[in-house]
Amino acid sequence: MKNRRYEVEILQIEGIYQSDPTTIFNQLCNKKKCTLLLESAEIDKKHALESMIIIDSALRISSLDNIVTIEALTENGKSLLFKLDLLLPLTVKNVLFENSRRLIFPFINHEIDEDKKLRSVSIFDTFRLLIKTMKIPKNLTKSMFFGGLFSYDLVNNFEKLPILNRNQKCPDLCFYLAETLLILDHKKKNCIIQSSLFNRKSSEKNRLKKNLQEIKTKLTQNVPKIEHRKIDQISLKCNLTDKEYIKIIKKMKQSIKKGDIFQVVPSRKFYLPCISSLSAYQRLKQSNPSPYMFFMQDSDFTLFGASPESSLKYDSKSKKIEIYPIAGTRPRGKTENGLIDLDLDSKIELEMRMNEKELSEHLMLVDLARNDLARICEPGSRYVASLTKVDRYSCVMHLVSKIVGRLKSNLDIFHAYCACMNMGTLTGAPKIKAMELISKFEKERRGSYGGSIGYFTESNNFDTCIIIRSAYVENNLATVQAGAGIVLDSVPQEEANESRNKAQAVIQAIIYAHSSREVV
């Protein structure tokens, strides 16, 4: 059977611009599964830049270990399955179902050299081949828009790491191929709604046209209030007490003294009920505006957060790839009534900038980011664009830097992500040894925490953030995970305090959204 490649047809209309994407998401998606809200804001001024909402998904792509599951959610998406069948290499076993495919990939050979391993057949080929099923229209971006998450544990498919318990339903990766995408440009104050047609069926085209008009009409109607359900008391629990966490930190410092590692990032989990996730996200966004904000509504879980830290960013026009390491954290300087004390805040910043431990930790991670880019960038193209800048958020301030390089012409964004995961600010250095140590002491999969969320397109544009300052919600229970970077000079109690400070913005947002008083 010949694989006939059709051009993606984009159906597009303009809607009424609204400044709050969260209320639009509530109006158009409500509790619809496989929907995603991505927001971005300026780091310094916190002004909104662009927001994107996947209103309808054509496909849901998820993986666990070496098995990828592709679910067609519409007839439009289903047409891509048949095209994909004809492109799969013989080394990939394809199990066919009426509305889905289960792809079983060969395990990575760990005995071959790093470059060959990077280019081996892998679960990332699912995305490469899906993009190849269609001709891409010229001068149109986002005609194939994939939004979703890569979990921290995805790295286990590519590196020999300990096998850990899986206590949550979070897959190794979970992405949606957008069928209907809403794009808000907050600078131009416009709203574009577009649908991607992946076949030539007139019935599907008419369905998408009708859907676009219905969405446009909905945007003119009264906006429903975001659900706000009260919980009288919230019990906040943690999987590790300060005493237990400090004990782990001390043991990890022994590994640093032995020379096994230079740095490591142990984490702990805070648990609390959350039945109004979108309300909690809205509160988090208001109290802690960040460069990356996200709300992912899956069939198995909800994930929301406001992350300060980019994971990997790639611009296909300039070929530039960026990493934005954050290391060095202090609480904001506040008065007794919770307002920012500018004088105290500046003193805390100065202390952080002059602190030898914070600077050595930060520069170590800058070097690690440079080494990550060295594997995938053209020789001589790497440079440090900014060094030890301070970014401020509601509860904490951070030391940040930016490292830039030009991606090699024979590599793509998936090679780049594979080479760089997981980011050193969530693992430590050397990465593999640090991740082994994390597995030994944390004893369970991290799931979404420390992975990344964002989007990529058919043109290779790629923008993701590290999943921190976030809540993973499953069965109405939120898990808020936070860690601290440990080096030789670390003071264990201070690191325990830091992990709690990092979790506070999300915990407070959840408590506020449910109008509750915290019970520790």
Curated annotation (Swiss-Prot):
Which GO molecular function annotations are given, in alphabetical order?
Answer: anthranilate synthase activity; metal ion binding
Name recorded for this polypeptide: Anthranilate synthase component 1
Per its record, the protein catalyses: chorismate + L-glutamine = anthranilate + pyruvate + L-glutamate + H(+)
Quote the record's activity regulation.
Feedback inhibited by tryptophan.
Q: Which gene encodes it?
A: trpE
Could you tell me the EC number(s) of this protein? 4.1.3.27
User: Where do transmembrane segments lie in this chain?
Assistant: none
The cofactor required is: Mg(2+)
Residues bound to Mg(2+) are E361, E498
* Gene3D superfamilies tied to this protein: Anthranilate synthase
Q: Which domain of life is it from?
A: Bacteria
Residues where chorismate binds: G328, T329, Y449, R469, G483, A484, G485
Its BP terms in the Gene Ontology are: L-tryptophan biosynthetic process
Query: Which keywords accompany this UniProt record?
Result: Amino-acid biosynthesis, Aromatic amino acid biosynthesis, Lyase, Magnesium, Metal-binding, Plasmid, Tryptophan biosynthesis
Q: What does this protein do?
A: Part of a heterotetrameric complex that catalyzes the two-step biosynthesis of anthranilate, an intermediate in the biosynthesis of L-tryptophan. In the first step, the glutamine-binding beta subunit (TrpG) of anthranilate synthase (AS) provides the glutamine amidotransferase activity which generates ammonia as a substrate that, along with chorismate, is used in the second step, catalyzed by the large alpha subunit of AS (TrpE) to produce anthranilate. In the absence of TrpG, TrpE can synthesize anthranilate directly from chorismate and high concentrations of ammonia.
Question: Which annotated residues bind L-tryptophan?
Answer: S40, P291, Y292, M293
